[in-house]
């Protein structure tokens, strides 16, 4: 007779079902239950990837909505349609509230549970990178002092992750490469520092290329995929720093192995 699954195992299974059904809000709820069930224990690689996928999809839909609405707002402003602009701003504010709530939810979980319980180098980098990502998402739409605070928090988290990654993970490790990818996007998009963005991306790419022959079959696909994204961004940024192609900028996607959706 098969052993009855633990609540933790049931929540993981339900999260996978929710992912298949593309019901990502529920996927987040199930993975938060997994996190609560493990207490001070660390999540498995599979569990942390599921948590990351869930939140990335929930936030990703709102980020896309915000960009579309902001673009429409700019067009209506240029046409002088003040009535439309007022309606659009209210709608954008609603989306921004949702974005804030999602980001604050995962950031609280990272600070209270996930980062303190991380014991291994790859776990620490994974969660600190995640912390940087969600502060960066806040910086995308905040303004004034709030934007400054979000940007500073992003920089602190990414730098902490980078310090650990550079000492504990090889240059070809997909989590280290994913961190470099997102950190460089932060420099380019949030800090408006294309030189730093290109420098970071190029260094990560070159260091990984130098050790490509040591890459195991297990992570070869993931690592080379992120290296391609780094190279794509470098091409985009260096070809024309003034180009409005920011929407094409690649960043590491939800899974721990940074595969794009």
Curated annotation (Swiss-Prot):
**Which SUPFAM superfamilies does the protein's record reference?**
14-3-3 protein
Its domain of life? Eukaryota
Q: Name one Pfam family in it.
A: 14-3-3
Family, per entry: Belongs to the 14-3-3 family.
Tell me the protein's name: 14-3-3-like protein A
